[in-house]
């Protein structure tokens, strides 16, 4: 065999790019915090019991290697922007997109804790859609751009009816309305699990912090991000395409612009749900 060709083959073996984020992936992990390992030198944030943070860290993930599917069953392209997929349905309509997925996670958390009165989201016209009113049989009607409640059904606090409520919200709320509801996080040093980078608009986008860890020697925090996108698709844990060695983790160190695979945010876009 030609010596030059052998050298070429060896070059492919030893110099080909690898996927560093695989160093942090435990294929057998069944939740966010067991699937994505923390880099050396960092300690995972321990969320308080029954908090939104604990809920997200413990959220189930689909089998390693699962592809993100769109609402119509087609595979998302590009395929190289995520490392894991959350085990939650996307529905059969093109509704659960960017901000919708975040509202879904927040609502699912509150529903699972029977904190029904805290489930409410604003429509883009400013109307507040309270889950408890919906579950008690009230329905929302529209006259022009004005929304109002009418009593039209019996009370139903079932999970199926909860999903009906969310579908209604996804139809009339989005990144623009959610951005106005959330409160601003003043400093990246204060970021928490459950915080959201969001830009309201048409289109706008939003990603949520699923997990976080802190440096053992500095105030640096690293974090995982998840998103849905357009069209509606499975919620996915994003790669960090700007830092292959740290990916899928992101860092708040010297962060001015947050570049994710499919959207760019400013540090001032960080917000959170009001408690």
Mark where each language-model region is.
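Low-complexity, Gly/Ser/Thr/Pro-rich intrinsically disordered linker/tail segments
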Residues: 221-275
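Generic hydrophobic, helix-prone segments enriched in Leu/Val/Ile
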Residues: 53-60, 109-110, 166-169, 225, ...
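Cationic-aromatic interfacial patches
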Residues: 18-89, 93-96
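Bacterial Sec-dependent signal peptides at the C-terminal "C-region" and cleavage site
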Residues: 1-3, 8-23
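Acidic/His-rich structured neighborhood in mature extracellular/periplasmic domains
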Residues: 76-192, 198-206, 211, 218-230
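Generic marker of residues within folded, mature protein domains
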Residues: 5-7, 199, 215
């Amino acid at each position: 065999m030609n010596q030059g060709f052998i050298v070429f083959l060896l070059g492919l073996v030893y110099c080909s790019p690898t996927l560093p984020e695989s160093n942090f992936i435990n294929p057998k992990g069944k939740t966010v915090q067991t699937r994505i390992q923390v880099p050396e030198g960092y300690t995972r944030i321990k969320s308080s019991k029954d908090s939104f943070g604990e809920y997200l860290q413990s959220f189930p993930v689909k089998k390693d290697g699962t592809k993100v599917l769109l609402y119509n069953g087609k595979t998302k392209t590009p395929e190289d922007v995520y490392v894991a997929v959350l085990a939650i349905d996307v529905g059969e309509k093109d509704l659960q997109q960017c901000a919708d997925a975040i509202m879904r996670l927040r609502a699912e958390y509150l529903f699972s804790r029977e904190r029904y009165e805290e489930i409410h989201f604003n429509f883009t016209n400013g109307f507040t859609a309270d889950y408890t009113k919906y579950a008690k049989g009230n329905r929302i009607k529209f006259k022009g751009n004005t929304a109002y409640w009418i009593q039209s059904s019996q009370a139903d606090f079932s999970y199926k009816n909860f999903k009906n409520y969310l579908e209604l919200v996804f139809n009339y709320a989005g990144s623009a309305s959610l951005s106005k509801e959330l409160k601003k996080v003043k400093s990246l040093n204060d970021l928490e699990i459950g915080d959201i980078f969001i830009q309201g608009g048409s289109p706008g986008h939003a990603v949520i912090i699923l997990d976080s860890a802190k440096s053992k020697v500095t105030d640096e925090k690293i974090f995982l991000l998840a998103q849905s996108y357009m069209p509606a698709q499975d919620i996915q844990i994003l790669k960090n395409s700007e830092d292959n060695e740290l990916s899928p983790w992101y860092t708040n160190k010297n962060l001015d612009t947050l570049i994710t695979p499919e959207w760019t945010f400013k540090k001032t876009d960080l917000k959170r749900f009001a408690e």
